């Protein structure tokens, strides 16, 4: 058998791989310092073009070497390895046990793949091989709570100096009216057990007269600030999996405004800052802060 064409093909393959490696190395390096400052991009592209031309030429040479190879006319023989099964002394030849183990592993692989193919053909459109009759429990939705659930939740909340009252002007979603001592009033628009909006006004302002009054802001700046902070707390306490806890936490936080005009700021110790009292309440400790002092 003539081995010279094979050696030529292998040599040409090494040359081709080397030229391809130079292309990727040049692409990874990018523009180098030896390209200079003027026209460095053009020099880089020219160098890359030359390397690609070299790869193309080496590929053609490799294809010509492949065409010169002639396939063997006779099947390949195992030569002396065909007599390994006749070897009786395992200490002299340790390859035979490994071959036997490989054949056993191949037989098991073929058997298991046959079983897997049969199961996949029977369950081609199913994600599971077996039929499962259990249905996944639907997750509770906080905006689909019944009116009785809302009534029971609000009825179980009791605080001093706070009055809670539920109204349903449209017989669907509830509006929770909160009165804190003689300090302020608030309208909490609920969708099921989900808080959608909070309107805060002074104690003397109209809030229960009509539906429109429950969406308009207060004419006092201090209560508009409290309303903005209530929206922040509403988003902070929101919990789709525990909506009852979210409402309880929000009402507990909102009740801390009973001392809106009494407690000083915990940071600066002053009652007024920019003509406003401490309108912010910490979400965990409920301590009063001015909006500029809470940072």
Swiss-Prot record:
Q: Which GO terms describe its molecular function?
A: transcription coactivator activity
Keyword Transcription in annotation: yes
Q: Which domain of life is it from?
A: Eukaryota
Q: Where in the cell is it found?
A: Nucleus
Its main subcellular localisation, reduced to a broad class, is nucleus
From which residue to which does the signal peptide run? Answer: none
Which biological process annotations from GO are given for this protein?
Answer: regulation of transcription by RNA polymerase II
Keywords, sorted A to Z = Activator, Nucleus, Transcription, Transcription regulation
Q: Which GO terms describe its cellular component?
A: mediator complex
Q: Per its UniProt record, what Pfam families does this chain match?
A: Med27
Q: Cystine bridges: which residues?
A: none
Q: What does this protein do?
A: Component of the Mediator complex, a coactivator involved in the regulated transcription of nearly all RNA polymerase II-dependent genes. Mediator functions as a bridge to convey information from gene-specific regulatory proteins to the basal RNA polymerase II transcription machinery. Mediator is recruited to promoters by direct interactions with regulatory proteins and serves as a scaffold for the assembly of a functional preinitiation complex with RNA polymerase II and the general transcription factors.
Q: Which family does it belong to?
A: Belongs to the Mediator complex subunit 27 family.
**Could you describe the subunit structure of this protein?**
Component of the Mediator complex.
Name of the protein: Mediator of RNA polymerase II transcription subunit 27
Species of origin: Anopheles gambiae (African malaria mosquito)
């Amino acid at each position: 058998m003539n081995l010279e064409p094979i050696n030529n093909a292998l040599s040409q393959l090494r040359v081709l791989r080397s030229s391809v490696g130079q292309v990727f190395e040049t692409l990874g390096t990018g523009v180098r310092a030896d390209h200079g400052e003027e026209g460095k991009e053009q020099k880089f592209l020219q160098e890359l073009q030359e390397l690609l031309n070299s790869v193309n030429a080496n590929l053609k040479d490799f294809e010509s070497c492949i065409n010169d190879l002639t396939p063997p006319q006779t099947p390949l023989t195992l030569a002396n390895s065909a007599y390994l099964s006749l070897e009786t002394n395992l200490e002299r030849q340790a390859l035979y046990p490994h071959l036997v183990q490989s054949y056993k592993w191949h037989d098991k692989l073929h058997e298991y793949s046959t079983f897997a193919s049969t199961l996949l053909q029977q369950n081609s459109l199913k994600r599971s091989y077996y039929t499962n009759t259990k249905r996944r429990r639907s997750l509770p939705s906080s905006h689909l709570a019944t009116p009785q659930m809302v009534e029971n939740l609000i009825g179980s909340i009791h605080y001093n100096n706070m009055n809670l009252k539920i109204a349903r002007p449209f017989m669907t979603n509830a509006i929770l009216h909160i009165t804190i001592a003689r300090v302020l009033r608030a309208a909490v628009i609920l969708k099921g057990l989900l808080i959608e909006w909070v309107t805060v006004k002074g104690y003397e302002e109209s809030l229960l007269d009509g539906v429109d009054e429950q969406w308009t802001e207060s004419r006092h700046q201090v209560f508009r600030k409290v309303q903005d902070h209530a929206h922040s707390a509403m988003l902070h306490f929101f919990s789709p999996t525990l909506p009852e806890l979210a409402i309880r936490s929000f009402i507990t936080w909102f009740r801390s405004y009973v001392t809106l005009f009494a407690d000083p700021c915990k940071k600066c110790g002053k009652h007024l800052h920019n003509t406003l009292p401490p309108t912010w309440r910490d979400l965990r400790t409920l301590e009063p802060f001015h909006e500029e002092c809470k940072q």
